């Protein structure tokens, strides 16, 4: 039976995706269209391209992770390095400033590159991490409970990111009654989110121990369906 401490440490691995999802949903498009001045159509296209890349890299990462043979385990090497592209992409997404005098094409390329990089970094961690949740125990109810914990922590992380943004970084000031229009608040907001991403990866990673092969997992799930 999985201990509560293990469930908590494993679930912390959902923090990066919770932060990323909240930011991409509520903040990213606003930043580029209202602060930096990228045309909304181009910003939307950049997000669409990143989603298309994600649709390819997610199943590809699953296949690669399943077939990996390493002294660290099948899942662990990718989770270990994931924080690098994840955090760099996330921070650089919010690095442009109004005085950089970038063209629409330059901004579009910048947004596309670092949105894709952030998603690739997230894929490197999230796909192996989710797969591990299906391997750590043979008990169906335990796996279900573990993944429930994971989703709950990810939801809390996303909600906390929103409160942190609106409550602190984008709080109203005399100069900017609508705090989100303050251009100086965005980069510190991104750096703070990236720090939480970076910290959550090793916390979750160090408590993971893979136990079963991919074949074991597939056959077990098929039997449970019957």
Regions found by a protein language model. Give the residues of each.
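Membrane-embedded alpha-helical bundles of multi-pass transporters/translocases
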Residues: 1-209, 214
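Positively charged, low-complexity/disordered segments
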Residues: 210-226
